[in-house]
Amino acid sequence: MVERLARALDLRAGTTVVDLGAGTGKLTRLLVPTGARIVAVEPLAEMRAVLEAAVPEAEALEGTAEAIPVPDGTADAVTAAQAFHWFDAARALPEIHRVLRPGGRLGLVWNSRDLDDPLQARVEELISPYREWYPQQMTQSWREPLRASPLFGAPDEFSVRWEQELTRDELAERVLSISAIAALPSARRAPLLDRIRSVIGDGRKPFPFRYRTDVFVFTRSSDRPSNERGTSFQG
């Protein structure tokens, strides 16, 4: 996935990429082999401290997508992994446009469970009643501000499917990381986690769970007609 993203964003030595909402650097560290200069923007000091220790090659700055702390035309590319749906798009899109150079590209990345996988579908069936809302990356409502914006053209898209082996307890921990589940009273949370564990069965052997990574690459509209159609392909 990262190799295809790097090609789509034309990341290489001599280019600069700004990683927004960088968190602890999960995507940031994967960009290092491209040879590009990496500027990681993260508002939380605790997250930045982890990022700086994990990815010393990156320049970590305090900031947000709505107030990016770099000059105009700094970046050849801007990335955001698992983050764009949290941005205030009305403010973030002009900022991203501002920091991109002519020809610059915006790469948005999301990981999600592959619901074509029967195991993942069963997990979703169990947890969906407990969600008060669905993340925008699942409903795709994050697309609307970009569709309406004159600042970026239609995206090029690709998806990559991958597997991760999880034990019963690792699966339960993964589900517990969902804020809506973690916030449940213990009397409701514990039985749910027991049902989640039962998806795998009684054994301790890890089971493969399928995931997918969806990538969307947008080009600055001043360099690409806004009515140009993007492409979509899967890997």
Regions found by a protein language model. Name each.
Residues 1-4, 34-35, 68, 86-87, ...:
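Tryptophan-centric aromatic hotspots in well-structured domains and transmembrane helices
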Residues 1-15:
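Conserved alpha-helix/loop element of class I SAM-dependent methyltransferases that forms part
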Residues 16-20, 24-67:
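Class I SAM-dependent methyltransferase SAM/SAH-binding core
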Residues 66-77:
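A short acidic, Gly/Pro-enriched loop at the edge of an enzyme's catalytic core
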Residues 80-81, 89:
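A short beta-strand submotif of the Rossmann-like class I SAM-dependent methyltransferase core
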Residues 87-95:
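A short, conserved alpha-helix within the catalytic core of class I
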Residues 94-164:
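Conserved catalytic/acceptor-binding region of the Class I
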